[in-house]
Swiss-Prot record:
UniProt: 1D-myo-inositol 2-(L-cysteinylamino)-2-deoxy-alpha-D-glucopyranoside binding residues: 52, 217, 259, 274, 318
EC code: 2.3.1.189
Reactions catalysed according to its record: 1D-myo-inositol 2-(L-cysteinylamino)-2-deoxy-alpha-D-glucopyranoside + acetyl-CoA = mycothiol + CoA + H(+)
Name the record gives this protein: Mycothiol acetyltransferase
Name of the top EC class for this enzyme: transferase
Reported function: Catalyzes the transfer of acetyl from acetyl-CoA to desacetylmycothiol (Cys-GlcN-Ins) to form mycothiol.
Polar residues bias: start-end ranges: 1-18
GO MF, one example: mycothiol synthase activity
Keyword terms, alphabetized: Acyltransferase, Repeat, Transferase
Record note on quaternary structure: Monomer.
InterPro entries from the UniProt entry: Acyl_CoA_acyltransferase (IPR016181), GNAT_dom (IPR000182), Mycothiol_AcTrfase (IPR017813), YpeA/RimI_acetyltransf (IPR050680)
């Protein structure tokens, strides 16, 4: 997220002139520069400013023509990306778009982000009110608000959604307990546990859409979105669990997908794995399938290694703050809130008095 009212590190303070704003045509070279920029911001902030879906949409726009391509704005200073603003365009008249943005660490505290953000929003025109702004790492588990939260409110946005990142550190005892809990769970006799295959693409998309019919992002996944993910270096089919009918593999009752990102830097809680998504067919809800599949995924991650053979040191996941059932489940399993992401919408303007 755009951060501008933060005191910059004097060791990296830029003395450059005012950056030039542009909405350049997306190219492979520009996408590589964006990736480097996003990685630099993430290393500095400890949290990514851009979601996986944003990166996927940019990649798709580069490869294929689309009716609603993302808007991509940059503030550039002599070949250096000082700030980036990405707006994922609404797919239809009822849809909302998503904004994610960031300022390079060395350009913060100089007014670069504020001026650039205002410029990019103006370029969206009358449609700007249809966009929602993501602030990743808006607050910590201690409740301390980030400069990005202050930035969002300063620019006329108010929180409309709260997403918790929850983390479970792994030690020998926790690993053993997760495996034991998973082994103690059984599926109904008409279901079997298996892992994802290519033949599951369309059945999975149908169940995912039904399970997340009211979810602003997950329920909209397309075949192209799915294939972007299953074609990613991090994808492991053995970590994508499906409960389907014994007599019909296409009848999916529930699923849990895990993710072990590649290229993780070593730290106290890294490498880590993620409970990527858990879904239950609405026709199969209420029978504890979500808990059973979640425990199976946790047991898998507890015993998994990264691409370098390093055991995972933590498991993380994301849950909406208003999903009290899921939050209670994860808390009971030992997860704690690490950071808070917030989605913001333009603040409602009061009608002028008659």
């Amino acid at each position: 997220m755009m951060v501008d009212n933060q005191t910059p590190d004097s060791s990296t303070l830029s003395t450059a002139s005012t950056p030039v704003y542009a909405e350049p045509q997306l190219t492979e070279e520009l996408l590589e520069r964006f990736d480097s920029f996003a990685q630099k911001v993430a290393r500095h902030d400890g949290v990514s400013a851009f979601s996986e879906q944003t990166r996927i949409e940019l990649s798709k726009a580069l490869r294929e023509s689309t009716l609603t391509p993302p808007r991509f704005f940059v503030a550039e200073d002599n070949g250096t990306l000082a700030a980036v603003f990405v707006a994922l365009t609404p797919a239809n008249d009822e849809d909302t778009g998503v904004i994610e943005a960031a300022v390079a660490p060395e350009y913060r505290g100089q007014g670069v982000g504020s001026a650039f953000f205002d410029h990019a929003v103006r370029q969206l025109g009358d449609d700007a009110t249809r966009y929602r702004l993501w602030v990743h790492g808006s607050a910590t588990d201690t409740g301390i608000e980030s400069p990005a939260h202050a930035f969002a409110t300063l620019h006329g946005f108010e929180p409309v959604r709260v997403l918790y990142k929850m983390v479970l550190p792994l030690d020998a005892q926790t690993r053993e307990e997760l495996v034991e809990r998973s082994d103690a769970r059984t599926l109904p006799e008409n279901l079997r546990m298996r892992t994802f295959t290519g033949a599951d693409e369309f059945p999975w998309l149908r169940v995912n859409a039904a399970a997340f019919a009211h979810h602003p992002e997950q329920g909209k996944l397309t075949l192209a979105d799915l294939r972007e993910r299953t074609g990613s270096p991090w994808f492991r089919p053995e970590g994508f669990f499906i409960a389907s009918e014994v007599e019909d593999d296409s009848a999916i009752a529930a699923f849990t997908w895990t993710k072990i990102p590649t290229g993780q830097e070593q730290s106290e809680l890294s490498p880590s794995g993620e409970i990527y998504v858990v879904g239950v067919n609405p026709q199969a809800q209420g029978g504890g399938l979500g808990r059973t599949l979640t425990l199976r995924a946790l047991a898998y991650l507890a015993c998994a290694e990264d691409e370098n053979g390093e055991p995972l040191r933590a498991i993380d996941l994301y849950v909406d703050a208003d999903n009290t059932a899921a939050y209670s489940l994860y808390t009971s399993l030992g997860f704690g809130v690490a950071t808070v992401d917030r989605m913001y919408a333009p603040a409602q303007q009061d009608e002028p008095a008659a």
